[in-house]
A protein has these predicted regions:
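Intracellular juxtamembrane helix-capping segments at the cytosolic ends
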Residues: 108-120, 306-320
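Cytoplasmic helix-loop-helix junction between adjacent transmembrane helices
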Residues: 97-135
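Conserved MFS/SLC helix-loop-helix module at the cytosolic interface between two early adjacent transmembrane helices
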Residues: 53-92
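Helix-to-loop junctions at the C-terminal end of transmembrane segments
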Residues: 55-66, 253-265, 351
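Helix-loop-helix hairpin linking two adjacent transmembrane segments in secondary transporters
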Residues: 91-93, 121-127, 131-176, 227
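Paired small-residue
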Residues: 6, 77, 81-84, 92-101, ...
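C-terminal transmembrane helical hairpin of 12-TM major facilitator-type secondary transporters
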Residues: 267-311
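Helix-breaking motifs and short loop linkers at transmembrane-helix boundaries and internal kinks
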Residues: 34, 66, 87-93, 233, ...
């Protein structure tokens, strides 16, 4: 892969770390801010909703700016937002800082996806997207477990200061390696051309399958710390090593999903979403058995991130050249709306007394909705192709 794609991977690592790090710090944050664990979990939902709002707004506002300039501005927002998190004197400040940080997220991955696919041959586009998203998997593999350990040893604020330093490093790498001209297009795209993508049914279906397909993961992953400690029975010190196992699964799934999508996008979409639903059902069955739970958490990581490149490429293809940046950013927002939906659904499940053990079952049901939407979308493709192939009467 070109060095510029690897630079985008570095930025993705920083953003991925700040998104997911709170999941390993929920108990510490809840205790320090004097709120319940479900209320602390809303910090995840707040971040996700900030991505959902910020992605389309910033994408449209920056559509005429050079792509590299946009990427650097977003990394600056990210870095300042994490510093604000570390300084938060109360829950409300922390929530506001998380939302500020989140504004950079969707547009960075949206613009980054367009830049990454512009740097490689057409048959390597999904792999280029997957390479950039390796930053997210490494963030989960190393950043989140490190954050959980760092928070346990030095406090959750120190973990956010560490992420701030990561942001500075990522800014420098993107500035040094990403070309100034890549991804800018031959001519500026008008606002009407960009927004017109929202009228395409396949784009909207693609966004919906991303929301529901990914929400299932976050029903479980948002509450992974209390699940492992309070239900499965692991000591708190075991959470970081288990998150390393999950992160290893994400890394495997991310690469596998890119390769599968390059070989056949439709099969990759259906196969990965179906696998994710099946693994979640399996996790529900073995959650009380420690060794089996660890094995299923590894498989959960593989299945979850195998969906990323197929879902992102599906929306890019449906959008076409004129709407690809907005559609790409909106799909990142859709991932995070799924994050918020999953965190909310998990919190409701807990608050209604169904218990932590019910979370994987709820998650599997939500993911199944994403699978049904994918099947519907592909059926529409076949119908449209058949109509186009019929000669006019």
């Amino acid at each position: 892969m070109p060095p510029a794609v690897l630079a985008l991977t570095a930025g993705a690592f920083g953003i991925g770390t700040t998104e997911f790090i709170i999941m390993g710090l929920l108990l510490q944050v809840a205790a320090d801010m004097h709120v319940s664990v479900p209320v602390a979990g809303l910090l995840i939902s707040g971040y996700a909703l900030g991505v959902f709002v910020g992605a389309p707004v910033l994408t449209l506002a920056t559509r005429r700016m050079p792509r590299k300039t946009v990427l650097l501005a977003l990394m600056a927002i990210f870095t300042l937002g994490n510093a604000a998190c570390a300084l938060a004197p109360n829950y409300e400040w922390l929530m506001a800082a998380r939302v500020l940080t989140s504004l950079a997220h969707g547009t960075f991955f949206g613009v980054g996806s367009v830049v990454a696919t512009s740097l490689v041959a057409e048959d390597k586009r999904a792999s280029a997207i997957a390479t950039m998203f390796i930053g997210l998997t490494v963030a989960t593999l190393l950043g989140v477990p490190f954050g959980a350990w760092f928070g346990l040893m030095l406090g959750w604020r120190a973990a956010f200061w560490a992420v701030t330093v990561i942001g500075v490093i990522a800014f420098v790498v993107v500035a040094a390696l990403v070309p100034g001209h890549v991804g800018n297009g031959d001519k500026p795209i008008s606002l009407s051309e960009e927004v017109a993508v929202l009228g395409r049914p396949q784009v909207l279906l693609g966004l919906a399958m991303t929301v529901f397909g990914f929400a299932g993961l976050f029903v479980v992953f948002t509450y992974i710390q209390p699940i492992l400690t309070r239900f499965t029975g692991f000591p708190e010190a075991a959470v970081s090593p288990i998150l390393l196992v999950f992160g290893a699964g994400l890394a495997i799934g991310n690469v596998a999903g890119g390769k599968l999508a390059d070989r056949g996008l439709a099969r990759a979409l259906i196969g990965t979403l179906a696998a994710l639903a099946i693994v979640l059902l399996g996790l529900a069955a073995v959650l009380s058995v420690k060794i089996a739970a660890i094995a299923l958490i590894l498989l959960l990581g593989i299945a979850a991130f195998a969906t990323v490149a197929p879902l992102q490429l599906r929306v890019l293809e449906a959008a076409g050249p004129s709407g690809r940046t907005l559609a790409s950013s909106l799909n990142i927002a859709a991932f995070n709306l799924g994050n918020a939906l999953g965190a909310w659904a998990g919190g409701v499940t807990i608050d209604r007394g169904l218990g932590l053990s019910a979370l994987p079952l709820v998650a599997a049901g939500i993911t199944a909705v994403g699978l049904v939407l994918a099947l519907w979308s592909l059926q529409l493709d076949r119908t449209q192709s058949a109509v186009a192939a019929c000669p006019a009467e």
